[in-house]
């Protein structure tokens, strides 16, 4: 999958200038960087929510995309009904609810869930379908460590089993190490480093990434 170069400008200021990248099927890419580095803008452009300055989709027109934003949404119906909006496979829905510890919330109104419960439901809903590319923007930010690890296991399995390319925006270096094959580091709207997660996070090549890793490892 070829991700073409693109840029994004707000009020005359370039907030993202991306050089392009070839993405591997079945691989998980973590996107890291400080607040304001361009991570979420990058995710929204790939999801088709924001337009690039070039007014073209950097992925082309025939790539199916699944997107889980930072702020999750729920319809005023049960948790199970919300999940089934992603696909009508009842067995798949039940399996995902079991694995994400949502079964006891089966009949609860989804708009009354806690933040962590809502995130798990949104993840289950997305995983009801297969996509060429899946973008998860801070999917576990509202979860505790136990459910974070459950979600990470499912995310990794989903990429492996479906063969989709998965992009995970995260603030957690530990999460990037645990589940991603490659990591992309953004700073001030630029991709500063990209490569194997183990290599990149353990032996940064640039001073910018070295300082970032040291700060977020405290």
Where on the chain are the PLM-derived regions?
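Catalytic Walker B motif of ABC-type/P-loop ATPase nucleotide-binding domains
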Residues: 134-137
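H-loop/switch region of ABC-family ATPase nucleotide-binding domains
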Residues: 170-171
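Conserved ABC ATPase signature
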Residues: 109-113, 117
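Conserved catalytic motifs of ABC-family nucleotide-binding domains
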Residues: 72-87
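Conserved ABC ATPase "signature" region
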Residues: 90-105
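C-terminal boundary and immediately downstream tail of ABC-type ATPase nucleotide-binding domains
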Residues: 198-218
């Amino acid at each position: 999958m070829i991700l073409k170069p693109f840029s994004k400008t707000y009020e005359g200021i370039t907030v993202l200038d991306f050089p392009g990248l070839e993405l591997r099927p079945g691989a998980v890419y973590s996107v890291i960087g400080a607040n304001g580095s361009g991570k979420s803008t990058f995710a929204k452009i790939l999801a088709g929510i924001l337009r690039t300055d070039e007014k073209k989709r950097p992925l082309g027109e025939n790539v199916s995309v699944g997107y889980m934003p930072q702020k999750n949404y729920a319809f005023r119906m049960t948790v199970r009904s919300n999940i089934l909006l992603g696909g009508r496979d009842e067995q798949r829905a039940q399996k995902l609810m079991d694995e994400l510890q949502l079964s006891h919330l089966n009949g609860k109104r989804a708009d009354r869930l806690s933040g962590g419960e809502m995130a798990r439901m949104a993840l289950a809903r997305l995983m009801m379908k297969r996509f060429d590319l899946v973008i998860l923007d801070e999917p576990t930010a509202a979860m505790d460590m136990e459910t974070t690890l459950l979600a990470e296991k499912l995310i990794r399995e989903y990429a492996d089993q479906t063969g989709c390319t998965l992009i995970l925006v995260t603030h957690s270096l530990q999460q990037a190490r645990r589940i991603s094959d490659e990591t992309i580091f953004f700073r001030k709207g630029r991709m500063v480093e990209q490569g194997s997660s183990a290599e990149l996070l353990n032996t940064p090549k640039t001073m910018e990434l070295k300082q970032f890793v040291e700060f977020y490892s405290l």
